[in-house]
Amino acid sequence: MKKFMYQLAILIAPFAFAMCSENGNIPVESNWELEYIYSNGSEMAPPEEHNATIAFLNDSQIAGDTGCNRFFGNFTATDNSLEFNNVGSTRMMCPQMQFENAFMSTIENTASYNISKDQLVLKDSLGNIIALLKKIEPVAQEN
């Protein structure tokens, strides 16, 4: 029995360490859809049929969609701190650019987060809630 437990521990250990390494508690390979942005004391919901999403990928990478343009970059998460960096995007012009600019500003201003059930809360450096996202199933990318 001891030998079995030892072998089991050896098999599980790499996965356990990989899950809690540099990505804090952000679940990699998770996808989130924006519900609200909070800016200057007001709440802004995505325009109808304007699904803004973000995916946390392996190797501390992100990919997302503003509802118009796609974006990509890196993230660093430790405990409850979260920082997005090297973020770039496509540059198409769309009718809802005000919303897209607000969403990208939210990404840039994120300093911390918490996850409760299937909701991701992004906060700025002062601890103010700046966005709420809900967990979703992965979206198939079009070629």
Locate the predicted segments by residue.
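Bacterial N-terminal signal peptides
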Residues: 8-16
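Bacterial N-terminal signal peptides that target proteins for export
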Residues: 1-8
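Lipid interaction determinants
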Residues: 6, 19-143
